[in-house]
Amino acid sequence: MSQEEQPKRPQEPVTYGDVFEVSGELADKPIAPEDANMMQAAETRVFGHTQKGGAAAVMQSAATANKRGGFVHPGDTTDLAAERGVTVAQTDVPGARVTTEFVGGQVVGQYVEPRPVATAAAMEAEVVGLSLQSAITIGEALEATVQTAGNKPVDQSDAAAIQAAEVRACGTNVIAPGGIAASAQSAANHNATIDRDEDKIKLIDVLAGATGKLAADKAVTRQDAEGVVSAELRNNPNLSTHPGGVAASITAAARLNERADI
């Protein structure tokens, strides 16, 4: 075999930023073998097996490539993974179970499993303390977002969705000073100037106790959900909503209210 035909080692390692939507220091870290092993173990604990095409599979492929390239060695672990953990968490939301995978505190994978209406109704009562005879309100749906996306840094799409929700809850286009919409916009503006996700204001900081922060509240309807989804989409450069985010929670609440006919 001539020198030109010799297989070449990759010039650079496969990093987290190459295969996942992560930011900050983690994005530049090569994926290490023990990181992949920890994710495989975490997926197996939750699902009973590793997910086909899931984070563990992606990480294993990347770690193997990095070992072949000589960038990492068997037994190596990324410092952020070792310090902050590799975890898989499950959260029940109206009509679905959301499974989220984390490395070093950042999301690297998410799966949404639809759930039957009866199960969803019972779950909603447990999560937000609702009577099954009462409709889910906008404030309660916003609070449910804390369960599914509380650690997400607030961006302009979140702020727009929260503003749309507050407008519909209060029945006025006037944004109340110090309300959740104003707080969300302030958080989004602040976060746009910050590089590290760890230093950014999160949804939990804005939406915790949302019901008590609204001047008024109302049961979520399909029209409310459509307005919130539209606002989040218009302000997202990718024209998508965030899994488990504000629009998703409002939509799930509206769907449950319709199915329960309350």
From Swiss-Prot:
Free-text tissue specificity from the UniProt record: Embryo specific, only in dry mature seeds.
GO biological process: intracellular monoatomic ion homeostasis; response to lithium ion; seed germination
Source organism, top-level taxon: Eukaryota
Domain SMP positions: 14-68, 136-192, 201-260
Compartment annotation: Nucleus, Nucleolus; Nucleus; Cytoplasm
GO cellular component: cytosol; nucleolus; nucleus
Induction trigger: Stimulated in embryos by the transcriptional activator ABI3. Not induced in vegetative tissues by abscisic acid (ABA), osmotic stress or dehydration.
Motif Nuclear localization signal (NLS), residue range(s) on this chain: 6-10
Pfam families for the chain: SMP (PF04927)
Keyword Repeat carried by entry: yes
Keyword flag Transcription: no
Keywords: Cytoplasm, Nucleus, Repeat
PANTHER family to which the protein is assigned, alphabetical: LATE EMBRYOGENESIS ABUNDANT PROTEIN 31-RELATED, SEED MATURATION FAMILY PROTEIN
Family: Belongs to the LEA type SMP family.
Function according to Swiss-Prot or TrEMBL: LEA proteins are late embryonic proteins abundant in higher plant seed embryos. The function of those proteins is not known. Promotes germination rate. Enhances cation toxicity (e.g. lithium ion) and osmotic stress (e.g. NaCl and sorbitol) tolerance during germination and in seedlings.
Name this polypeptide is given: Late embryogenesis abundant protein 31
Organism: Arabidopsis thaliana (Mouse-ear cress)
